[in-house]
Amino acid sequence: IDKNKNFLDVFFSDTIETSLQHENPVIIMAGGFGKRLMPLTKNCPKPLLPVLGKPVIEHIINKLKSEGFKNIFISTHYLSSMIREYFGNGKNFGVTINYIEEKKPLGTAGCLSNFKSNNDKDFIVCNGDVLTDISFSHLLDYHSRNKSIATMAVREYFWKHPFGVIKTNGLKIKSIKEKPIEKTYINAGIYVFKNRITKILKKDKKIEMPDFFRLLKKRKY
């Protein structure tokens, strides 16, 4: 951003590649219909929409590559042929790309039931429309150090009430706060999982990511 607050560029350190190479698979979720961005997504899948001359998903792949993640899987459904045609096997982008094709929409976690890893490493999942400066390496390290089954990246979100908020005790007013600001945490659309957790998913059954986390917690997997 320049001194006049004009947006100039997004920098993801694409040109600064680490010497450390990670074998961990990364699944990029790119199968959604992008309904909220219609009509832009009528003839183009949302992950291929350009930001500063490159598709959103290409920014993600470049960020991953710069951190040494080159074992990439892309989950596709809507207009999947366009994504396959653009990236191919990933050779032109300096990575290896395999595809997980959803024959029907499986939600934000259902495609993991069709994921066949090419190693036994923990894997990262990232939504295909996320522009982020998060360190995937640090997230993976955090996940490993805590010996977690599943890790979700979150971000702080501040929300201002549009009205005065009243707290009561029965019919008595305890306090009044005029349009207070509350801090919460929201899902950032990036996760790390133990490789074996995909076994609890039923093949080709639709499931959303929040429900998947509830399932993991319930089973204490």
Describe each region flagged by the PLM.
Residues 18-81:
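N-terminal glycine-rich phosphate-binding loop and ensuing alpha1 helix
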Residues 123-124, 131, 137-144, 157-159, ...:
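Catalytic-core segments of class I nucleotidyltransferases/pyrophosphorylases
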Residues 33, 128-130:
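Active-site metal-binding loops of divalent metal-dependent hydrolases
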Residues 11, 78, 126, 168, ...:
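A conserved hydrophobic position in a structured secondary element of the catalytic/binding core
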Residues 2, 6-20:
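Short beta->alpha transition motifs characteristic of CBS
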Residues 48, 165-168, 213:
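A structural signal for short hydrophobic beta-strand segments in well-ordered beta-sheet cores
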Residues 146-156:
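A short, conserved acidic/glycine-rich loop-to-beta-strand motif
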Residues 3, 54-127, 138, 203-204:
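Conserved N-terminal catalytic core of the sugar/cofactor nucleotidyltransferase
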